[in-house]
Amino acid sequence: MKNEEKHIISAIAQRDYEMKLLWEIECEIRSIDQFLSAFSPELLTQIYDDQPVDRKNLICPVIEPIEEYVKKWQNTRYTGLDFSQGQQDIFTERGERVRSKSEKIIADSLYRHGIPYHYEYPVYLRGMGTVYPDFICLHVRKRKEILWEHMGLMADPAYCKKALKKEEMYIKNGYRTGIDIIYTRESTDYTISTKVIDRIIKDTF
């Protein structure tokens, strides 16, 4: 068999293989889409919610109703970081004190979108000890906590070094960027906008 003929036959075989592969991939995608369109974990909690009040009092739900879960999560007591004397007084719409105007923007955006959050809730990282991420947010539907670190002084070399080290420790402790933790950054030449923050919240929650 000549090299030219071998090349043509090989190209045809490769084409046929890729067409079959593409067809199977498309079938898998359709199956996933069908599953996602029918998947509704809320139905599991709805079974309890639909019970009459008298019957609810007799039942111990296997899955805690979402309203109770969120309320319990939001009311968790904790000790955050203290504020230094002379630090600027900046308060969120929810009435809590934060350290910067950018943190206020993030907090107010979370509040406006109905995302439960804690400010500077203590988290333990192996190899670093206790840290206080700016926000721990609750993805209500997934019942999943997502951290949010806002690094607002990246133009400062000492701050930047410390921030990058902290980010490295998050990774080593299993926090996946964009899945378990959100990072936003600012410097003297760049400030984050409310539109960007809103986009992050909509895409994540």
Which role does the model predict for each range below?
Residues 50-115:
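Solvent-exposed, charged helical/coil patches
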Residues 1-73:
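Nuclease-adjacent, charged terminal/linker segments that flank catalytic cores
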Residues 15, 93-100, 156-160, 186-187:
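Short, charged/polar micro-motifs that form catalytic or ligand-binding hotspots
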Residues 90, 132-166:
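Short beta-strand-loop-alpha-helix junction that forms the active-site gateway
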Residues 96-98, 111, 116-141:
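Active-site metal-binding core of divalent-cation-utilizing nuclease and nuclease-like domains
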